[in-house]
Amino acid sequence: MAHRESQTAAERNEYTYRQTVTLDELDNRGAARGRYHEVRDIIFSPEHERTEQVVGHTENALKYLRLTDEDFRDIRDIQPLVLTEDTLWNYETRFRGDETIDGIDCWVLLVRPRQILGGQRFFDGMIWAEKKDYNIVRLEGRAVPEIRSMSSENLFPRFTTIRKPVDGKFWFPVYTLGDDTLDFRTGPQRERLRIEYSDYKRFGAESTFTPH
């Protein structure tokens, strides 16, 4: 599986795509009372270097939550996690059985970080990998660690990331969903997260998959 993930990571690095992040603060009735919305294109520069470009105006009308550097690192690295041969050694994995997801026969694995040092971010949760080609098709868990100090708290929601095949070969993230209540000292705060990864195009080619 890690070998397949390394192939997936290398292939995804050859694609441009659009990343749309929406985070809603919800009141105790489930109504939105604050929102963060941002669209980024992950593209190549004229020098063929990978870069990001914000599209349009970023809306930040959050009232109680504040997005931190760790949140943006998680959006970039944890929610669309790829468990390559270079990163898998950071994790303990345990077999949890098998399950059919959307008609796909999968192995189910528990994945937890072996050790967390200062400043590191990891995934803690479950993954579903198809039995046929070992592609990861689903992740459920959260980014860790939570960060608590006397003066501040930085808590992170549970999420589910779904992958779909792009160009009929490798499975790339297409959306991340999270709906969780974070237990701050000042009181619980429910939030709803949605990240869409769309318009995948191989550099110099046309896209064959655009999620809706």
Model regions and ranges:
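Structured extracytoplasmic
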Residues: 1-123, 131-137, 142-157, 165-175, ...
